[in-house]
Design a protein with these regions (language model features):
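Conserved Radical SAM active-site core
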Residues: 51-212
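Short linear capping/connector segments at secondary-structure termini
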Residues: 1, 31, 193-195, 228
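Catalytic donor/gating beta->alpha subdomain of glycosyltransferases that bind UDP-sugars
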Residues: 215
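Flexible, glycine/charged-enriched surface loops at secondary-structure junctions
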Residues: 219-220
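N-terminal [4Fe-4S]-dependent radical SAM core
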Residues: 2-60, 64-65, 75-80
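Conserved small/polar residues in nucleotide/adenosyl-binding loops
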Residues: 226-233
């Protein structure tokens, strides 16, 4: 492999490891994207998803809106409904707290449970919950209605400027969620972010942490490597 261009030797090694473990068959599951809420308590410097209350028509999608999107996805051949959302917006925004109280929900996580339950019952799509850093009881609640869940580990660095205003982005919180999901035998998607101020060694350390958790519990179904978008103006 000495005559290969930089990187190709690594690709060859990765390919050999993959082929030995799972072969060359590629599987996929079409999914429809359901952004249940774009409000978020975190203030990540790279985020292009979250919006403040003034920029959204409602703090949360209604169950009717969720089902409309899910049915469109089912007609298009989707098998899964990917619930994505900001983390615990009720802790930052009074509008989110008020909406949840008025609609009879204890928290955003409880509303995710209700929305996922409706999608599962009404459309047959398999909900995938991506509600961020959750505690064991919250993971267990969603486990009743979501065959799989996910949360990006992102990084093990606790000193990055982009996470300065993001209480749920501490390595301890993310790792605790990863471990709890494994202990509950929840098929889990995770991964790291590249380009947020971390070093190559930081990326390797984060990937090792994911691999070690999977070695203990066997629950990681996807490990994603996302590149960070340009910072928002």
């Amino acid at each position: 492999m000495n005559d290969l261009r930089p990187g190709e030797a690594l690709f060859e090694r990765a390919r050999a490891i993959r082929d030995a473990a799972t072969g060359t068959r590629i599987t996929y599951s079409p999914k429809v994207f359901i952004p249940l809420t774009k409000l978020c308590q975190d203030r990540c410097g790279y985020c292009t998803f979250a919006e403040p209350p003034a920029r959204v028509e409602s703090p949360y999608m209604s169950i009717a809106e969720v089902l409309k999107v899910a049915r469109q996805g089912a007609r298009a051949g989707c098998h899964e409904a990917l619930f994505t959302l900001g983390e615990r917006p009720e802790l930052r925004y009074p509008a989110a707290r008020t909406w949840l109280v008025e609609h009879g929900y204890e928290s955003t996580v409880h509303y995710v449970h209700a929305a996922a339950q409706a999608v599962l019952a009404e459309t047959g799509l398999l909900p995938h919950g991506n509600a961020g850093a959750l505690y064991p009881d919250e993971l267990a609640l969603l486990r009743r209605v979501t065959p799989s869940q996910g949360m990006m580990l992102e990084t093990l660095r606790d000193d990055l400027d982009c996470h300065a205003g993001s209480p749920d982005k501490t390595p301890e919180r993310r790792l605790a969620t990863l471990e709890a999901a494994g202990q509950l035998a929840i098929p889990f998607t995770t991964g790291i972010l590249v380009g947020i101020g971390e070093t190559r060694d930081d990326r390797i350390a984060a990937l090792h942490a994911i691999a070690e958790s999977h070695a203990r519990h066997g629950h990681i179904q996807d490990c994603l490597l996302y590149t960070s978008p340009s910072p928002r103006d």
